[in-house]
Amino acid sequence: MQNKKIYLIITLLIFIVSISGCSNKKETVKEDLLGINYDTTSNEVELSQYDTTNPVVAMYIENYGSVVIELYPEIAPNTVSNFISLIKTGFYDNNTFHRLIPGFVLQGGDPTGTGTGGPGYTIKGEFAANDFENNLKHEKGIISMARTSASNDTAGSQFFIMLGTAEHLDGQYAAFGKVIDGWTTIENIEKNETIANQNTGQLKNNLTIKKTLIDLKGKEYNEVEKIEE
């Protein structure tokens, strides 16, 4: 009888240890899938591989990975010049994404991380409501400039990536590019990040943009036309 009790206790302990080991293994796999150990230096995207004459941007997001965006200077020339200028000066390096509304937008580019900051100037809004022809639709993957409702010319550095289609934004905001690679990175952010304020989409923890690189494909672009604040 005593030997039977000892056998049962040993069997139970082995079962508990086995379950604990499986649990830890699952957590490790989950972290790997999310890119928790992502290293921008060893996972740098080769931008020359993208067959386009338009500028191509690689944005490296901490804990997730890279997103590649093609810019459309023929659609919104000054908006693209502004984005290029901010990238070349390192403005977006260690900047953040601060806002997420699943199925709608992922927004970033504010140096304060609050949704109220910018580069210290604004640019003219290149969209129909501001007497500028821009027919790029706000569909999934499109990148567009954020602005305040106070004026059409209040965009600066904040931008948003469309997570779905929003026709009511067409003609009201300056769409200027599209995500062409790394959409899995965006999907993982959308699925796994915690939203602190459901009304505004403010993230509990802002996502760091570790580094942003650009390939101009051998072309030169005009200096950005600024509206000084």
Describe the predicted segments one by one.
Residues 2-3, 7, 18-229:
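Cyclophilin-like peptidyl-prolyl cis-trans isomerases
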